[in-house]
């Protein structure tokens, strides 16, 4: 019988319990871990039909949560949520398939964005807005941003919205995409930068928010054959982790898609894998309490060490990400 996989909190609890700390110190650290464990992360993905909401969910996270469609018909008909322990993904139906349908979807989005949790804060931590990079008509999405998301999120809108341009391989109708290297050539790269700048300017003009979009490709297949591998998912994940409140980040740690090929290709403007790992390790330092500092690195991550437990705790975190990012 296959042993049930332990989540990140259970692994960290084991590390603390197996340490040589005093019982009082163990109790204190377990208490802080419990505080973190009680935090739930809610991420909503929105966009037009065909922008790739479901394929993005499946590419980022370790779950087969929705059928990924290649055709033009909507694949998701009602707003859905997928629960992975403390991580909840809200998959909003695609917009643009009828006025009445859009009104219903918009009402659902507004209701969810205005929902307040037991802590008195909004349920939704982050909204990922997905646009089709190959589309010239993004009016439906701009309307959603200007008239729904920003008014609902208020003063925190700039901190809780990520703008994404998916299917960047099709930005120039499939031209100038280096299939073997799975990245854009210089011509397409410059086009993508201009496209992102145009979207950024349009959103700023309509809302006053200055948000830099991320160009990426969630990857997709047709008739069982892979058409394009994921590209720049590392950058998107890094942005998500940065925006999620620090005390909630651990909810994502072991819920990331473990397919290494999903994380192999990006724009190389930064080492997103290493930076993401550091973001998670910071949570350990903040909430499991680290007592002393030493030089050097722990499994490649600079930082402080807490007797025997920090090495184990940090080891748990970095092992997860090194197996993914290499």
Question: How should each PLM-predicted stretch be described?
Answer:
Residues 274-326:
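Membrane-inserting effector segments that mediate pore formation, membrane fusion
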Residues 1-88, 93, 98-282:
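Conserved GTPase G-domain substructure that encodes guanine base recognition and part of the catalytic core
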């Amino acid at each position: 019988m296959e042993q049930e996989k332990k989540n990140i909190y259970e692994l960290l609890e084991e590390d603390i319990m197996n340490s040589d700390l005093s019982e009082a110190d163990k109790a204190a650290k377990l208490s802080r871990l419990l505080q973190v464990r009680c935090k739930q992360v809610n991420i909503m993905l929105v966009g037009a039909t065909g922008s790739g909401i479901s394929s993005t969910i499946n590419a980022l996270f370790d779950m087969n949560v929705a059928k990924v469609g290649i055709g033009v018909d909507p694949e998701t008909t009602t707003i859905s949520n997928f629960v992975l322990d403390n991580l909840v993904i809200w998959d909003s139906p695609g917009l643009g398939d009828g006025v009445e349908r859009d009104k219903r979807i918009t009402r659902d989005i507004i209701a969810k964005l205005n929902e307040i949790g037991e802590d008195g804060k909004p349920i939704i931590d982050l909204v990922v807005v997905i646009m089709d990079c190959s589309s010239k008509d993004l009016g439906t999405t701009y309307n959603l941003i200007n008239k729904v998301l920003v008014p609902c999120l208020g003063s925190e809108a700039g901190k809780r919205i990520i703008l994404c341009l998916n299917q960047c391989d099709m930005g120039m109708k499939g031209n100038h995409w280096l299939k073997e290297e799975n990245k854009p050539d210089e011509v397409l790269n410059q086009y993508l930068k201009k496209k992102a700048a145009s979207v950024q300017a349009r959103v700023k003009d309509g809302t006053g928010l200055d948000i830099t979009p991320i160009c990426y490709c969630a990857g997709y297949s047709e008739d069982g054959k892979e058409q394009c591998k994921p590209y720049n998912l590392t950058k998107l994940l890094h942005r998500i982790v940065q925006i999620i409140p620090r005390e909630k980040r651990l909810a994502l740690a072991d819920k990331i898609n473990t397919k290494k090929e999903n994380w192999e290709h990006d724009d190389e403007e930064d080492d997103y894998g290493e930076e993401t790992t550091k973001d998670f390790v910071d949570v350990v330092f903040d909430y499991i309490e680290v007592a002393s500092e030493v030089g050097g690195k722990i499994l490649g991550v600079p930082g402080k060490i807490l007797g025997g437990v920090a090495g184990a705790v940090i080891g748990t975190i970095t092992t997860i990400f090194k197996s993914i990012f290499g």
